[in-house]
Regions:
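Conserved alpha-helical scaffold segments that buttress catalytic/binding sites
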Residues: 3-196
Length: 196
């Protein structure tokens, strides 16, 4: 991704065409590694390939539901909102591990479509019980930004959450045991860890 202009953090029309071309021959089903969190919007391109209704579970310190800053250009901070606004197959979004402060800044009007398990909620046993008792009817796509993890568990190029790697593994185990997972992507690589 890094070598394509128009794609770092924001994805202009030409960048979108180039990236969609790069993934055209690959199905949404499977596990996809995406690079840094600056490219988390690639989840939108993967989920746009799903032809049946699905729910999206996002592990991210940031809800990624900001309105676009520039002429409806997709960004790493707006892609979840874009999916909700434009992908009719996405029936529900569950965002796990986001900052309470950032959740409060999410635009109004998405309450019926989005459920949050904030990092504060997951600090309490009741939050874990609520997460574990939930069930989604239908296919699930999982998107993980490693910035949901605490700095002891991962190094990323964004401010980070408070989940430990062990906690993320436990939450994923709940989903994998109960749900029909159709695809997974993982982002959050840090340029310093990539030696760039």
């Amino acid at each position: 991704c890094i070598r394509d202009s128009g794609t770092d953090g924001y994805c202009d029309r030409e960048g979108a065409l180039a990236l969609k071309g790069m993934i055209a021959d690959y199905p949404a089903e499977g596990v996809h590694f995406i690079d840094s969190g600056n490219y988390h919007y690639l989840t939108k391109f993967w989920t746009d390939k799903l032809e049946t209704p699905f729910s999206l579970i996002v592990f991210d310190h940031h809800p990624d539901m900001q309105p676009p800053l520039f002429d409806n250009i997709l960004s790493c901070g707006s892609w979840v909102k874009d999916i909700l606004d434009h992908n009719n197959n996405c029936k529900k979004v569950i965002i796990v591990g986001s900052s309470d402060k950032l959740i409060q800044a999410v635009p109004k009007g998405y309450e019926r479509q989005v459920r949050f398990y904030s990092e504060t909620t997951l600090m309490h046993e009741e939050g874990w019980q609520n997460f574990s008792s939930g069930h989604i009817n239908g296919p699930v796509y999982i998107s993980i930004d490693k910035d949901v993890l605490n700095p002891a568990s991962a190094a990323t190029n964004w401010d980070q959450g408070s989940l430990s790697l062990w906690e993320l593994e436990k939450l994923l185990a709940v989903i994998l045991q109960k749900e029909q997972v159709v695809g997974i992507d993982i982002c959050g690589e840090c340029s310093t860890t990539l030696n760039l």
